[in-house]
């Protein structure tokens, strides 16, 4: 009897040890692309027998009454050229260092009572009423938070300023916040106020703004890149943009972004762009596309950060996909405030083919931290920042002990308050075709391997219905252009130029066609969109 109990006890102990070992093994596997490696073996071996490589030129089956193509973008020409190295005229473009400037913008002002108020978020009295000389502001009455330089400033209304019996005002410290801004200084945007940040009560304005570095890999998302530059151009201090002469699939491609930088297309933002050139394709990337996908971000981070000069440990690093655009207010908050934790993510509005097909939920991907954490915890590797939990990294405890900051991951925005936009497959039909044939060999099924999926008429039908390549159909209605955070402001202000992203070009509901035409102005915008623009601009 005792022997049986002893054996039973040993069996339970062995089962417990096996369970613990399995859990450790499973935890280790969760950080290795093991399923992807398995998935990448069979499809490639078999597909080469059944499918030829995709043709370079988009193929469209002829159909009567076929709608005209919206645009002929730069990338519609054949990308399968010999690998291109930088020309002599711009051969140093990918070797030049970038000196980060100091941000001298005066974001905050002080009230005469000693309060610190964020200018864009505070209600100010621009035109004093007659007979109230106490509301007039002189140069010597206000000073910037950032330094001794004194400038004429508008009078900052305080939350507790009240008229006394004889017309005198009592001065208090608080600021009166405009809609969308919160906190004692009116510098906390809604996407932070309604986020899961656990240290909101510790937020304080900085004396010196951080510099913000935004890193992106680019293939042919030039319209979305233009939108990013206009959305974030005044708050981001350096855009680190990586371009390769190979697609994610390993095929040669021309360096179109480098060409656009040198021919003046992006002249308005050229002074803030650090160009990174990846001139090789990683070994094994053709067999396992995730190797190539990860390597692009690793190279982008390491080469880009190594060429940044005047970099400080508390500067902010944000790495995005080209179709992920953070909202300006959230990025500006990270620049101007102390007290938030790291790493951080953005809740982004999800859409497909254009902003008109809104998808449920949000995209929430960890994409930012300080330069200090990027170097000390993630080993200067952007893909680790996006895909690895910080507490699995070996040096995170040392970083906490050295800095005195407890690492807590949080996200700007919420499922109800978007902090950016993720516009997936947002191209013209030709652009979607190019994305199909350029896609990595790891995100299966790889739809670019199927000839019928590359047909332009089929692609147009997907845009019209919101369907997917596997035959599933959209189960949610088109988005309303008048809704908050429908699209970045630059898109709405240039409606005609980006109409293919804002309106479904292949679908016109019969019941609303005439009514929509009656509500459109001379610029082609609907009354709802015009009203929204008037509100935002006012």
Curated annotation (Swiss-Prot):
It is a single-pass type II membrane protein. Pathway: Protein modification; protein glycosylation. It catalyses: N(4)-{beta-D-GlcNAc-(1->2)-alpha-D-Man-(1->3)-[beta-D-GlcNAc-(1->2)-alpha-D-Man-(1->6)]-beta-D-Man-(1->4)-beta-D-GlcNAc-(1->4)-beta-D-GlcNAc}-L-asparaginyl-[protein] + UDP-N-acetyl-alpha-D-glucosamine = N(4)-{beta-D-GlcNAc-(1->2)-alpha-D-Man-(1->3)-[beta-D-GlcNAc-(1->4)]-[beta-D-GlcNAc-(1->2)-alpha-D-Man-(1->6)]-beta-D-Man-(1->4)-beta-D-GlcNAc-(1->4)-beta-D-GlcNAc}-L-asparaginyl-[protein] + UDP + H(+). Residues 1-7 are cytoplasmic. Its EC number is 2.4.1.144. Residues 24-538 are lumenal. One of its GO terms (biological process) is lysosomal protein catabolic process. This is Beta-1,4-mannosyl-glycoprotein 4-beta-N-acetylglucosaminyltransferase. GO terms for cellular component: Golgi membrane; lysosome. PANTHER family: BETA-1,4-MANNOSYL-GLYCOPROTEIN 4-BETA-N-ACETYLGLUCOSAMINYLTRANSFERASE (PTHR12224:SF0), BETA-1,4-MANNOSYL-GLYCOPROTEIN BETA-1,4-N-ACETYLGLUCOSAMINYL-TRANSFERASE (PTHR12224). Residues 121-151, 509-538 are annotated as: Disordered. Glycans are attached at residues 245, 263, 401. Keywords: Glycoprotein, Glycosyltransferase, Golgi apparatus, Membrane, Signal-anchor, Transferase, Transmembrane, Transmembrane helix. Belongs to the glycosyltransferase 17 family. It comes from the Eukaryota.
